[in-house]
């Protein structure tokens, strides 16, 4: 009767460990456009605009992308430049159009338009950084426009993301050093603020936006490696549970495997907690970039802006919900792992206990003294 009972305990632990690991599969989607385009995103974002600074920025970027698209065609990079239809808006770079939805995941993202996926691609080790996703999409579309290099669209995206990273770091350093010189260069490039207009100066707004972009870049790199580490530990947890079951089939009491079972389950929950917390913090950060409509009685201005860069619409994806379900299973696994490990761990032998008691008891000579 003892063996079936041990087998049932091990079976429950194995099912839980396998279930939590299977729920990591959605985290690896949104990476491939070939075949069935599966995507269970952590978040979905759309560029919609909100504050005056964000609207001006989006309008400028759209016009710049339109110019780049025309240059890509006119410079002979496309072999279809004689066809007038290639100049139509739907054939140009449309990254910042409000009908485009980006589905973000740890290892890649998908671009969706009118409920149909345009493409999915891996995002290397850059994680879910929204701005890098948008930059990569611009590079991929430029690669698609230049049809003579249509097989190198991923290289276009990679090179543009690398350029963005270098440019962001340089601009951040430039604005920080220029701040100590009275923003002389910034005023020359951006323009001096109107003294009659109250509010934050354009220079401070742009510095705030650059700092926010830099923080998002660094933070998402950390979240990416947390996610990779969590998947590795989740797989190791299956191996430990399997080894624990093999040990139970040989004998009832053990020392090493119960300790490994408790350690692996504890480490898994700790790393999963860090990943979940990082995702929640990132969601809150993205929500600060989302316009908030507030209806005030007697107020003409209904929009309240917190950062000056409200330009995104953010929603939680199915992958985030599955991550919460996986996290709950990992907690159940942790509790059962501790109960099973404590129940089946080897108890100290009587000889060992007698030796310990003897070493701790005072000698007769000391008692006489």
Swiss-Prot record:
One BP annotation, GO: spore membrane bending pathway
Subcellular location: Prospore membrane; Endoplasmic reticulum
Segments passing through the bilayer: 7-27, 221-241, 266-286, 320-340
Lumenal topological segments: 28-220, 287-319
Cytoplasmic-side positions: 1-6, 242-265, 341-369
Entry superkingdom: Eukaryota
Alphabetical UniProt keywords: Endoplasmic reticulum, Membrane, Sporulation, Transmembrane, Transmembrane helix
Cleavable signal peptide: none
Membrane topology: Multi-pass membrane protein
An example Gene Ontology CC term for this record: endoplasmic reticulum
Main location: membrane
Spans annotated as Disordered: 348-369
Family: Belongs to the SMA2 family.
Function recorded in the entry: Involved in spore and ascus formation. Required for the efficient assembly of the precursors of the prospore membrane to a continuous prospore membrane.
Descriptive protein name: Spore membrane assembly protein 2
């Amino acid at each position: 009767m003892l063996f079936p009972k041990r087998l049932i305990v091990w079976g429950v632990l194995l099912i839980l460990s396998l279930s939590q690991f299977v729920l990591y599969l959605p985290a690896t989607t949104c990476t491939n456009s070939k075949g069935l385009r599966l995507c269970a995103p952590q978040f979905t974002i759309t560029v919609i605009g909100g504050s005056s600074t964000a609207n001006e920025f989006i309008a400028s970027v759209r016009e710049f992308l339109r110019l780049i698209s025309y240059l890509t065609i006119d410079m002979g990079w496309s072999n279809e430049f004689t066809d007038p239809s290639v100049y139509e808006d739907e054939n140009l770079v449309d990254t910042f159009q409000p009908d485009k939805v980006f589905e973000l995941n740890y290892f890649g993202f998908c671009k969706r338009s009118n409920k149909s996926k345009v493409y999915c691609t891996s995002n290397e080790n850059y994680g879910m950084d929204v701005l890098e996703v948008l930059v990569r999409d611009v590079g991929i579309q430029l690669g698609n426009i230049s049809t003579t290099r249509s097989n190198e669209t991923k290289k276009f995206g990679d090179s543009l993301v690398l350029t963005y990273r270098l440019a962001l770091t340089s601009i951040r350093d430039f604005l920080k050093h220029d701040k100590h010189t009275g923003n002389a260069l910034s005023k020359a490039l951006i323009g001096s603020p109107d003294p009659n207009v109250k509010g934050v100066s354009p220079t401070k707004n742009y510095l705030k936006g650059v700092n926010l972009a830099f923080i998002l870049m660094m933070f998402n790199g950390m979240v990416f490696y947390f996610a990779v580490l969590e998947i590795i530990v989740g797989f190791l947890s299956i191996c430990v549970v399997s080894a624990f079951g093999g040990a139970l089939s040989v004998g009832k009491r053990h020392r090493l495997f119960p300790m490994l079972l408790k350690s692996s389950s504890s480490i898994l929950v700790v790393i999963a907690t860090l990943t979940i917390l990082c995702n929640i913090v990132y969601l809150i950060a993205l929500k600060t970039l989302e316009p908030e409509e507030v209806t005030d009685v007697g107020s003409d201005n209904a929009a309240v802006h917190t950062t000056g860069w409200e330009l995104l619409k953010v929603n939680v994806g199915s992958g985030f919900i599955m991550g919460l379900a996986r996290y709950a299973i990992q907690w159940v696994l942790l509790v059962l792992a501790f109960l099973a490990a404590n129940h089946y761990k080897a108890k100290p032998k009587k000889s060992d206990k007698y030796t310990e008691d003897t070493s701790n008891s005072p000698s007769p000579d000391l008692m006489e003294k």
